[in-house]
Amino acid sequence: MSSQQAFDADLARAMSRRQFLVRLARASSAALLASSPLGCATAHGRLQRRLLGDTVIFTPVQEKTVAKIIDGFNPPDTEIRKRLKAEDPHYDPVDAYAEFAWAHGDDFLANMRFLIDFVNVLPTFTRTFATRYGLPARFELQRFHPLDANRYFLFLRDSGLRPLRNIFSGAKFIGTAPIYMNERVTWKVMNYPGPWLLDPAKRDADLAHSTSFDMAKETDDNVIALRRRVLAHDDLRAGLETARIAGGQDRLVIETDIVVVGSGAGGSFVAAELAEKTSQRILIVEKGEFLEPADFLQRERLMMPRIFDTEFSTTQVFGREIPTLSTTVVTGKLVGGSATINHALAFEPPRPVIRDWREQNGADIDYDDLAPHLDAIGKLLRIAAVPESQISGGNLALRRGAQALGLPHHGPTRRNAHECIGCGYCDLGCRYNRKLTPLNIVLPMAARRGAQVLANCRVDAVLLQPLAGDGRDGRTHRATGVTGYLTDARGTKRERIEIRARRVVLAAGPFSSPRILMASGVPDLRSAKGAQRAVGERFSTHATITFCGDFDEPLYPSAATPPMGYFVKKYEVDDQASADPDRHHVRYALEGMLNHPLAHAQLVPYESAESHQAYMKRFNQTMTLAVMFRDRPVGRVTSRAFEYELAEEDHAGWLDALRTGARIMFAAGARRVFFNAHRPLILSEPAQIDETLSLELVRQQRIQITSGHPMGGCALGGDRRRDVVDSRGRSWDVDGLYVADSSLLPTSLGVNPCYTVYALGRFIGRTLADEIGA
């Protein structure tokens, strides 16, 4: 038995022992002492005093564990750590990570505490590891020497047990993120140019290249108009009735006609259509903050907690779901939703996909139903091809590689942006108001016609009222509003709130919309009628893989104009005898990507601290490519997490996509190609592609999936027993309840879904407005 196999067997036995559970529970209980002054007595206590007074972010043991994780991945004797100590002596990586985790909110912090405790306690039960390397038995990680901690993490990385490999990924994030957050030293070491916000001369020069400022003036005025219709929490508390409900709990009560839950691509267009065509009172509820362009600070450490909602696939440990980085899905949590922080790519829905919805799902919708909405949205958001002069170095390399291989390539891509100046921070919000989004175009349209926005309000359930008899069209209940709670900027719960309305539109996204329905009892309503529970099912992600090519010439991946300029598509024909292009499905697409230090540190393979830092120093010579795969909708959203495994039928196609991407990189001139995998997956020549990128690698799912395109969970269709809503977004089970976001999509699209969701939102909004009348 190899040392790695012995280690895996030892850990497998350890995790099955009751003593491990007891030890872990004891550590987790200590973390719950939130009112204890423990943090103030630790070496890293000054941050906790500044932020929280006597409330701890991490316990002393957790702080020591975080410090050891950081030391394990970036030991104090490495170049970056030495320079940090010399040039920025007051920078404490543990404090930096504590502040970062705290800013993400209580749920994220609880998950991180559990992960930290797990990583700390696990070595106590790994006698094989201790014996082989001459370590005292029963050591916790916090007591390891940095070199031994590093060796321990490499054992986790190479484990044959998938949960342990996923734990390594979580530890890698903790161990690298606080190092690459540092602006004064680390950015200088890796030659990262940093935000244009820090270089006013460069910013002003590029702004001057724009042909006019008319559009920027218009979008600025739009955001001001929207701001006036955003409800302040203090005003609500002062002016609203407080109702006492069963159990003695108080809640604020708002009355309106239509409540739209979610302000992104779908919800914004529903609200705009209803505001224009009806006289109904409309309230748009958003769990995230209202941020204006000046709030987009172009720094990952500051913006990620405020604008990103990150969902991790989970690993079961003693009945508890703990987050991993095996599959990560990122969505937006701010007024304007994901559409405000995406890359503004505008791909029309593929005709074959819409046709399949009709033929295979019984959906009463076809491409012609969406075409007028696509056309209107294209004009409203000024969707146009990116000028050739603005294509970034990375995307030119993508085109060069595709041409060398004779692969058909498409581009420049079309985007909903006007006079983009190429700052490279599309994914952190457009500070210059050049990206045309729900925030600065669509929601202001609704606001100017009377709609209001309630930000920092998390909805948890729909209020349902039973209908007499058989109800209307088989619908047994009526929606009468929603319940939830106001939050602070971190998402911490404040007052309970009840919003009473005659109609409810869920547009909260493929995670929140299904969970709201689950909490409302809709799956049980369906089961009582003999229908499939369906809610949360048919979830897909585009199974996106991000990988990198290391080039000799600078490509500047953080300053792309636009983030994606060219792309390569692979098609499959569902009818081999047909020449009709409408029978050609997009199987996968390869697109150039933006990148910044925190995210890049997770993509870079980890062999040792020195090798990882060497890769990071070549940041500007790196091209990042995403393989977006049209996966089968086999995932499932649950009440607290999501379950996702790539379908076995997709393995061969996914492998073809990975190999094609690697070949393009080498054909473009890359000297090596590396993938976002648990173990280092590095190719130094094209001859290694077929052998290294194997079907077995895909089956073991050792390559990590990171997606921004969740779809499904409230699938539309024509079968009330199988589908959650009909083709107009109407719930099959609840009268007055609608869904209008990407959770509607019964199958994966194969292209970026935002434009499709815009069109579905406008289509559903127009249909609902026609039902209501003026």
What do the predicted segments below correspond to?
Residues M1-S16:
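N-terminal secretory signal peptides
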Residues Q48-M190:
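Flexible, low-complexity segments enriched for small/polar residues
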Residues V56, Q316-F318, N342, Q532-R659, ...:
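FAD cofactor-binding and catalytic pocket of flavoenzymes
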Residues L147-D148, F155-I167, G332-V335, A339-C420, ...:
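Rossmann-like flavin
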Residues P178, K188-D235, D364-A461, Q465-P466, ...:
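Conserved redox-cofactor binding core of oxidoreductases
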Residues F269, E273-L283, G288-E300, L334, ...:
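Glycine-rich loop(s) and the adjacent beta-strand/alpha-helix scaffold that form part
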Residues K287-G336:
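N-terminal FAD cofactor-binding segment of flavoenzymes
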Residues G422-C426, L463, R671-T747:
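A glycine-rich dinucleotide-binding beta-alpha-beta segment and adjacent secondary-structure elements
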